[in-house]
Amino acid sequence: MISVNDFRTGLTIEVDGGIWRVVDFQHVKPGKGAAFVRSKLRNLRTGAIQEKTFRAGEKVARAQIETKTMQYLYANGDQHVFMDTTSYEQLELNEKQIEHELKFLLENMSVQIMMYQTETIGIELPNTVELKVVETEPGIKGDTASGGTKPAKTETGLVVNVPFFVNEGDTLVVNTSDGSYVSRA
């Protein structure tokens, strides 16, 4: 058990029969009344975000999440196949389980598979990935100084707003948490 006063971003807890990751939290001490902790939690099974308020000092169960390094192999219909890099066991995940992460997955990419007891609850990507631009408008000479952006489609189908100097065939570094352009590789 862990006190809500010890909440940290990224902490995984069990509340109301679900497994949640703390996305954001705020300790509130009103002038009148008892202190409380306002939190924003992400359900690791469904991806839904919920705001929940706890009384200060309340205890919640900490969820023990194990991670395994696995390699993404291929898509088989709406199933995606991953291989354990040590035991060579294969694991299939449904498209709905990894909907957000699909935009960043490339074949042979190493990812962290999150397991709760024996249940696979999702994957954790690296902070950034390198994706190749397959479609974008050509930049016009002189546009690099203006600081604007244009849309670019990557090899995974993700559309990223990029600076005008980025061309088709360039490799981009993309932030996996929000899908934003970081730099050229």
Swiss-Prot record:
The keyword Protein biosynthesis applies. It comes from Bacillus licheniformis (strain ATCC 14580 / DSM 13 / JCM 2505 / CCUG 7422 / NBRC 12200 / NCIMB 9375 / NCTC 10341 / NRRL NRS-1264 / Gibson 46). This is Elongation factor P. GO terms for molecular function: translation elongation factor activity. One of its GO terms (cellular component) is cytoplasm. Pathway: Protein biosynthesis; polypeptide chain elongation. Pfam families: EFP (PF01132), EFP_N (PF08207), Elong-fact-P_C (PF09285). CDD domains: S1_EF-P_repeat_1, S1_EF-P_repeat_2. The gene is efp. It is found in: Cytoplasm. Involved in peptide bond synthesis. Stimulates efficient translation and peptide-bond synthesis on native or reconstituted 70S ribosomes in vitro. Probably functions indirectly by altering the affinity of the ribosome for aminoacyl-tRNA, thus increasing their reactivity as acceptors for peptidyl transferase. Keywords: Cytoplasm, Elongation factor, Protein biosynthesis. NCBIfam families: efp, PRK00529.1. InterPro entries: Elong-fact-P_C, NA-bd_OB-fold, Rib_uL2_dom2, Transl_elong_fac_P/YeiP, Transl_elong_KOW-like, Transl_elong_P/YeiP_cen, Transl_elong_P/YeiP_CS, Transl_elongation_fac_P. GO terms for biological process: peptide biosynthetic process. The keyword Transmembrane does not apply. Belongs to the elongation factor P family. PANTHER family: ELONGATION FACTOR P, ELONGATION FACTOR P (EF-P) FAMILY PROTEIN.
